[in-house]
């Protein structure tokens, strides 16, 4: 533990500039430090050889660099990899690397556990422990890049791991700004998708603060079904949620994504599909249809392939783009709704 020293990876460029100035050093040193942290992946100030020894000594005295530690990696038969990270306080989170034809997609977490209580989600079973710091969000990407030193790179980032990103808004926003900064990880905002259960005021705030891709975990065409599956809907019902979606800025040809987990006998009938079409009328969007991924002691079942295809065909008939998403990593509990760092934590 680094008691009383600030983790410099929790700081923005402006904060590092202020910090460096307080040490009597030139502000441009902050940009050098950012480059070392994110472009070079420096794990210590001693690696930052463009800084004088005196500056490095000062930084070592006042600050530290801490990153999540890879505790375990599991590989699925389809190539998906689930990474268990140990944090400084011995909490555990999970990230997922999903292989594409020419690159990787990184699915990262924003909280230790989750308090949203969605009934179809394994993460909800472990409860909520705490929010992740900016360094713990960006640190997942840095460590995943270390893990993939050669070959295809990480090109896309989805904030769909453990936790509700908009319930950890300030830290998530700060992390995204570091991820997209020229002095940070340098990702385009077009390559980042944030998934939310639907905290409506924060969707509106996100639209004012950033321009990233937004995915809504919808999962039901009516308030009664959605409130049963997702307690957040009792506070932010569908009419208010969809109004926020209609107002969300989508430059160019971007579209909102609605994620719809198909659960047998709950939300997957042809009548549900017809209601969904009416609900989303007028919103520029696409739908990701996801077969419910079963987990230990879950109360729900995966629908048949026939049910899934029939649901998709109704959406397509109404001119919606509806993609049936392959459930990657199901055999290692790395698929949608299956992450739970606690499950592996107890075995370490």
From Swiss-Prot:
Disulfide links within the chain: 107-336
GO annotation, cellular component aspect: cytoplasm
Location relative to the cell: Cytoplasm
Cofactors named for this entry: [4Fe-4S] cluster
Active-site residues per Swiss-Prot or TrEMBL entry: 94, 336
InterPro entries attached to this UniProt entry: Aldolase_TIM, Methyltransferase_A, RlmN_N, RNA_MTrfase_RlmN, rRNA_lsu_MTrfase_RlmN/Cfr, rSAM
Binding locations of S-adenosyl-L-methionine: 163-164, 195, 217-219, 293
Domain of life: Bacteria
SUPFAM superfamilies noted in UniProt: Radical SAM enzymes (SSF102114)
Keyword S-adenosyl-L-methionine found: yes
Cofactor comment text: Binds 1 [4Fe-4S] cluster. The cluster is coordinated with 3 cysteines and an exchangeable S-adenosyl-L-methionine.
GO MF entry, a single one: tRNA (adenine(37)-C2)-methyltransferase activity
Main location: cytoplasm
Catalytic reaction equation(s): adenosine(2503) in 23S rRNA + 2 reduced [2Fe-2S]-[ferredoxin] + 2 S-adenosyl-L-methionine = 2-methyladenosine(2503) in 23S rRNA + 5'-deoxyadenosine + L-methionine + 2 oxidized [2Fe-2S]-[ferredoxin] + S-adenosyl-L-homocysteine; adenosine(37) in tRNA + 2 reduced [2Fe-2S]-[ferredoxin] + 2 S-adenosyl-L-methionine = 2-methyladenosine(37) in tRNA + 5'-deoxyadenosine + L-methionine + 2 oxidized [2Fe-2S]-[ferredoxin] + S-adenosyl-L-homocysteine
Keywords for this protein: 4Fe-4S, Cytoplasm, Disulfide bond, Iron, Iron-sulfur, Metal-binding, Methyltransferase, rRNA processing, S-adenosyl-L-methionine, Transferase, tRNA processing
Sites where the protein binds [4Fe-4S] cluster: 114, 118, 121
Pfam families linked: Radical_SAM (PF04055), RlmN_N (PF21016)
GO biological process, one term: rRNA base methylation
Similarity comment: Belongs to the radical SAM superfamily. RlmN family.
Function (record text): Specifically methylates position 2 of adenine 2503 in 23S rRNA and position 2 of adenine 37 in tRNAs. m2A2503 modification seems to play a crucial role in the proofreading step occurring at the peptidyl transferase center and thus would serve to optimize ribosomal fidelity.
HAMAP family from the UniProt entry: RNA_methyltr_RlmN
Note: Reaction proceeds by a ping-pong mechanism involving intermediate methylation of a conserved cysteine residue.
Official protein name in the record: Dual-specificity RNA methyltransferase RlmN
